[in-house]
Amino acid sequence: MKSNTKIATAIVASFVLGGGTVSVLHAQAKLPAYAFVEIDVKDQDGYTKDFLPKAQANIKEGGGKYIAGGFNKAISMSGSPPPTRVVLLQFPDMDMLKAFNVKQRQLEAELGSKYASFRGVAVEGVEQK
């Protein structure tokens, strides 16, 4: 009888500890981060041939991926009309997005500003329940 009690206690303890471990691991998981970028392209040919391949390489190297957007794919829901290019990017977490942004700002200043003006906003995702 005593050994059955010990086994039952061990089983209950393992469930309690296991559930606590899952909660801790879940709480430590980083949330994805998103970049919403508005681009007013002045020279689409130059932008597409010269700047865009380098920007796409930066996104990939930075761990990002395209979620939505492109040339003339956005519509205005209210307020001013959208610029010629709007892009939504996803990154594994805000730290990776920030690291990407440092490199991307440099590329935009050195090359992209010849062809377009940029406005970007970063936002952290929310936990899905």
Segments the model singles out, each with a brief description of its role:
Residues R105-Y115:
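A common structural junction motif
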Residues K54, K103-R105:
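Alpha-helix boundary/capping residues
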Residues A10-G20:
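Bacterial N-terminal signal peptides
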Residues S113-K129:
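C-terminal end-helix/capping segment
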Residues M1-I11:
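Bacterial N-terminal signal peptides that target proteins for export
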Residues G18-K98, E124-K129:
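Short S/T/G/P-rich N-terminal loop/turn motif that feeds into the first structured element of a domain
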